[in-house]
């Protein structure tokens, strides 16, 4: 096969001249020009006039970090023939006998001239900093000091496109670091502090008792400084936000800081650079670039010392607390802080020292906050396969409508470059808001600090604590005008946001029910991302509408928690959850799609069957399953790589400093190479499946696929980029980037992105294959039987004269899929029959099941298994049973377990009633309702009354499929003969015991876990109490009390005993007869319908009481 020519062969290669300056290939030198100038340090003898001067070199090799232990002091390179100065008539210097250790002779023929690579002289201006004005001097005892002034400057590029330099005033003399001290090589940081020598105390001999002094830059006076006096405006008792509000003020903004103007004016240039940014980003850990080091100051330094165990120093004027890390370790440090939930920013130098020299003297190296990373916006590093979402929520009250609250929301996956926006209506239970939070599973939630109700804040705290990792809740100050609908539209249009979206942002928003509140939430998200310097994400991101419930089986947040869909109730982890059971996906995109499908089970019979067809084909053809798995293992995270590639088109990388910009370009080369090779594996998979004609035909019905072969096919298009990668970036995994490579990469990416929509379709198709293959693996590897469900449409009410088809739920051999015992023993299978049979000979079963049984008998497990079977079926997955027939379920409601919410002030019974109220308000005929021990959170009589009334309402008014588990045994007698209720119980048995046991507990209770006809006579709570370890004496007392209460309370239910012989069915007959008799009593003619009614009643009575011979 002839090798495909590179797509770049049609373009003329750019020359070096045309590409010069696009990407700087020079690494940022340690220059350190901003870290602090080179200073002359003068050492004097404590007992003589002789003094020796030596300059501290600022070469790259001599720059040191503050987080490393003291090392051997670097020695100054002096010109050949250098001799220390001696004072006439005085003894030798105190250091004269060891000066040879600090002096290294320069053998180069430089005529005694100092190298000017690291030192740039300045003129005597306000920006000049004399060494003796800044660095403490070692004075002789007679006070004489030899002075040799050297001034220094910093330079950089003359023009910086799209870069706003941090405003600084250059008229304040001082060092070039926020630590208020110049960076200098260390003699255990002796040069950081001025040492005053006395005859009775020499600091070198007693270094543990040094006295730190402050050299006044103006008058040169020395004065002792107490720790913390320089930054009293940072102390907790004095700190204020930008509006001068204290932390106890409800409107206090913890993101900003007020710096007194007089203090800011006295700061040096670099200090102003740092604090002007920090005052607006107090919630961010800010790394400040100084030469070849990144440093943290004050509050951030404390955090670095605490979290990263870095050594903290008290360096600089005012004893500024400081920690630091070298360039090589910054990425690892940032990832550690992100993993612990911190937000991290980096203030970079925009020039190197060489560029600074080129601009001339009297210059300040400009710096800029170029990057802010947060746990919710991370796009690189170890972020895992799960989607990382940042969510913004806005709430408005709709008092005139049935649903009193509307929530607008917007969220983003920065790694995949995808936005979603939508709105939901909710009631006081906040069930819909809980569903949103469970579906999105955000890392961080932005909400209006004053516009969110107390109920919504409770829901935020409740549903964001269900997982094993904490979610950050970030209140956002309300800013009028920036987040209203009109203002947001203006911001999007004026800044060109979402220009790279495959769909217009107007289409995503305008179709929503409450688009204004959704736009407000989107505005909050945009403001936040702009603050984090993520303009590329906003400009190139795709935006889509998001529907929480529409077109799918509704599963609210509480139901997801009760059924343990994503997080277990033990430790909040994934073990023992539905997601974990079905997750056999190989690719990261498949894992994310699986979660999305579980949140949105289908409600369309045709779509469900299309998925089931592919699953059945996989289970029947193991070879296709194996081939698919082999290709999927080769795939990288194509979705995130495509987002990364899209964000690089016309990005802001050109304004980054040379070293950082080169690093970003190197990452882009690697990402582009990976995505091209990854799509090759993906397309090869689809082409291999085309040989399996049946599989590919099923896949085309399920997904939208672009043309793969032919002149316009993706296969030929992709091969051109493969050729370009092989020729121009053969070592793309670790390619050194030149100016020519940068322009080549830009051309390739722009051509590749032209078919971004088609690439997204390929990714979605491959992800669907991965998920459906995962379903097939779950069915194949299951320890119990798995069956393909038979799905019927939702029930449709017809005219009274026509037969009405109601909902059905018929599952035989049902078992809980992930309740397998440790020894591998399966749960006992059971049959669930609710509603009208569609395939049988017209048999009809009641839609409501009243379930009783002993504690620990398996009632809750059966309830959960039933719900999970419905979710399995409507996902398009095989169901853990022998056979399954169901009509579509529109909503699953659950009221399981007993729990209170102490932190939100809600008791167990209030939680029960709130969840039950949501069921009564929203349940329909096609819903599945699961109620477990309703009413146990209050007194016996109140609980029984509520359980009775709720059950009767759902049975007679809603007529939905329902499983109602209870320990109120009189309920079974109340509904014993009700035609729409069937009573069953979880069976148990007893085994005699030889040892002594309390009265009534002399037999062991054996749980059979099998669903059996009829009601259970007791709950056998005393036997369970013995099993739990309650002492025999206590149980015996309880047994006596139970017998007494039964005799007392039994009288109150005597009427129920009598009514069991005159059931609800008889009441219906009597009502019909009375109705007809009233018509006859009023001399009204008896119509044909009345005769039909009488005939039906006669037939029902005859069939009920006449036993066939």
From Swiss-Prot:
InterPro entries named among the record's database cross-references: DNA_mismatch_repair_MutS-lik_N, DNA_mismatch_repair_MutS_C, DNA_mismatch_repair_MutS_core, DNA_mismatch_repair_MutS_N, DNA_mismatch_repair_MutS_sf, DNA_mmatch_repair_MutS_con_dom, MutS, MutS_con_dom_sf
PROSITE patterns: DNA_MISMATCH_REPAIR_2
A single MF term (Gene Ontology): ATP binding
Gene Ontology cellular component annotations, sorted alphabetically: nucleus
First-listed, main subcellular location of the protein, grouped into a coarse class: nucleus
Record's keyword annotation contains DNA repair: yes
Descriptive protein name: DNA mismatch repair protein MSH7
Function: Component of the post-replicative DNA mismatch repair system (MMR). Forms the heterodimer MutS gamma (MSH2-MSH7 heterodimer) which binds to DNA mismatches thereby initiating DNA repair. MutS gamma recognizes specifically the T/G single base mismatch, but not trinucleotide insertion-deletion loops (IDL).
Domain of life: Eukaryota
Listed Basic and acidic residues bias regions: 61-74
Organism, as annotated: Arabidopsis thaliana (Mouse-ear cress)
UniProt record similarity statement: Belongs to the DNA mismatch repair MutS family.
UniProt keywords, alphabetically: ATP-binding, DNA damage, DNA repair, DNA-binding, Nucleotide-binding, Nucleus
Biological-process GO terms, alphabetical: mismatch repair
PANTHER family according to UniProt: DNA MISMATCH REPAIR PROTEIN MSH6, DNA MISMATCH REPAIR PROTEIN MUTS FAMILY MEMBER
Quaternary structure and partners: Heterodimer consisting of MSH2-MSH7 (MutS gamma).
